[in-house]
């Protein structure tokens, strides 16, 4: 079970992500953003959190043009599984792999806290072990987590069960309290909370374990 973890200039969560997937039996590779290929046995691509290119211009706006993103787009189009966490979610939106955009938090401040969330849809590889409306706790740490999408596309997200998670108290102003989504084919996932930081009791929550474990093992079966 191999996982390609993409590193951009400014990425800072690659080693947390690497550690998390290694706990579930994943063989992890750190892939540089200038690379033009993925490992030949790659089952899953993860774009971790951080501040790619210092978040200059707009979060993820520069990273979307890196050579590796063309490879990831092809990988996703062929049905490969892709996960974007925090800055990775922003990059996937900028690259057009996920709909919508992430704006500055409504309070204009960086928010770092343990956050209560609610499972919206479990009909996907990422959340299949959870129950609908189940409340979980994951850390968030972002300044630009305010998810925006227009009304027409929001209706499509709902109809296609693409909304994965919602905040219970909407700390950043996101439309419909959305914290995570997937694409229509349900092989590209993005969320602002950090499941890789919630895999051990000593970290305050284990609620992220099943997300990563589910996705890794489903991706291997593809």
UniProtKB/Swiss-Prot annotation:
<feature type="active site" description="Nucleophile">
    <location>
        <position position="86"/>
    </location>
</feature>
<comment type="subunit">
    <text>Part of the FGAM synthase complex composed of 1 PurL, 1 PurQ and 2 PurS subunits.</text>
</comment>
<keyword id="KW-0436">Ligase</keyword>
<keyword id="KW-0547">Nucleotide-binding</keyword>
<keyword id="KW-0963">Cytoplasm</keyword>
<keyword id="KW-0315">Glutamine amidotransferase</keyword>
<dbReference type="GO" id="GO:0005737">
    <property type="term" value="C:cytoplasm"/>
</dbReference>
<comment type="pathway">
    <text>Purine metabolism; IMP biosynthesis via de novo pathway; 5-amino-1-(5-phospho-D-ribosyl)imidazole from N(2)-formyl-N(1)-(5-phospho-D-ribosyl)glycinamide: step 1/2.</text>
</comment>
<protein>
    <recommendedName>
        <fullName>Phosphoribosylformylglycinamidine synthase subunit PurQ</fullName>
        <ecNumber>6.3.5.3</ecNumber>
        <ecNumber>3.5.1.2</ecNumber>
    </recommendedName>
</protein>
<dbReference type="InterPro" id="IPR029062">
    <property type="entry name" value="Class_I_gatase-like"/>
</dbReference>
<dbReference type="InterPro" id="IPR010075">
    <property type="entry name" value="PRibForGlyAmidine_synth_PurQ"/>
</dbReference>
<feature type="active site">
    <location>
        <position position="196"/>
    </location>
</feature>
<dbReference type="Pfam" id="PF13507">
    <property type="entry name" value="GATase_5"/>
</dbReference>
<comment type="function">
    <text>Part of the phosphoribosylformylglycinamidine synthase complex involved in the purines biosynthetic pathway. Catalyzes the ATP-dependent conversion of formylglycinamide ribonucleotide (FGAR) and glutamine to yield formylglycinamidine ribonucleotide (FGAM) and glutamate. The FGAM synthase complex is composed of three subunits. PurQ produces an ammonia molecule by converting glutamine to glutamate. PurL transfers the ammonia molecule to FGAR to form FGAM in an ATP-dependent manner.</text>
</comment>
<dbReference type="GO" id="GO:0004359">
    <property type="term" value="F:glutaminase activity"/>
</dbReference>
<keyword id="KW-0658">Purine biosynthesis</keyword>
<keyword id="KW-0067">ATP-binding</keyword>
<feature type="domain" description="Glutamine amidotransferase type-1">
    <location>
        <begin position="2"/>
        <end position="222"/>
    </location>
</feature>
<dbReference type="GO" id="GO:0005524">
    <property type="term" value="F:ATP binding"/>
</dbReference>
<dbReference type="GO" id="GO:0004642">
    <property type="term" value="F:phosphoribosylformylglycinamidine synthase activity"/>
</dbReference>
<keyword id="KW-0378">Hydrolase</keyword>
<feature type="active site">
    <location>
        <position position="194"/>
    </location>
</feature>
<dbReference type="GO" id="GO:0006189">
    <property type="term" value="P:'de novo' IMP biosynthetic process"/>
</dbReference>
